[in-house]
Regions:
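Residue-level "edge-of-site" marker
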Residues: 67, 134, 163-164
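Alpha-helical transmembrane helix bundles of large polytopic membrane transport and channel proteins
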Residues: 157-177
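Short acidic, glycine/serine/threonine-rich loops at helix termini
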Residues: 25-26, 40, 88-90, 114-115, ...
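Conserved C-terminal guanine-recognition region of P-loop GTPase G domains, centered on the G4
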Residues: 94, 99-160
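P-loop NTPase switch module centered on the Walker A-proximal segment
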Residues: 1-104, 108-110, 154, 158-160
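Short amphipathic alpha-helical patches
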Residues: 48-52, 117, 173-174
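Residue-level signal for alpha-helical context at structural boundaries
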Residues: 42-43, 118, 164-168
Length: 177
């Protein structure tokens, strides 16, 4: 399918290693029916970690472009490595994107990768979005994470109480606000 420039969005995923960037890519591809089953890092079957070394180490080493087609738009998602030994990959991706999506977990919260991602985006003058992963794990604290983000990134994060998430079998917490 052909796209005009108005129908293409380029975003990069940022965050610490293990915060769910590659898993989010898998979910996007699965939800849009680009793949028929979710890949797993432990099995070496994720779309974005295709290199033999990435499969062996079970983490991203280089950035991968994941094309996602949704609602007559093309979303080019750049899945960046989470370990900052590979920060050059992140800096390169910021040159071609419209925005960044910072991933963090509901269990671990705001870590070094979250802060560095925020700083990279701010320095590049790019808007940031946040994605809180692993909400279904024991001791996940989604409301506390939202409030912590509001405090830590007070000048750049808005409408945190209007957030919502979709998860099979879970209720939308934004209904309680």
């Amino acid at each position: 399918m052909g796209y005009t420039a108005n129908d293409i969005r380029n975003i990069c995923l940022l965050g610490h290693g293990g915060d769910g960037k590659s898993a989010l890519c898998e979910s996007m591809l699965f939800t849009t029916k680009a793949i028929t089953r979710l890949g797993k890092r432990a099995d070496g079957t994720t779309v974005s970690d295709f290199d033999d070394e990435e499969k062996k180490r079970q983490y991203s080493i280089s950035s991968s472009v994941i094309p996602v087609e949704y609602n007559k738009c093309k979303l080019n998602v750049i899945d960046n490595p989470g370990y900052f030994d590979f920060a050059g990959q992140i800096v390169q991706s910021l040159r071609v994107v419209d925005a960044g999506l910072i991933c963090l977990t509901a269990k671990s919260g705001i870590g070094v990768g979250t802060e560095k991602g925020w700083k990279y985006l701010a320095k590049a003058g790019l808007p940031a979005m946040f994605y809180v992963s692993k909400l279904d794990e024991e001791h996940a604290e989604q409301v506390e994470q939202a409030l912590q983000m509001a405090q830590d990134f007070s000048n750049g994060v808005s409408n945190l109480m209007n957030y919502s998430y979709l998860m099979a079998g879970k209720k939308d917490v934004s209904d309680d606000a």
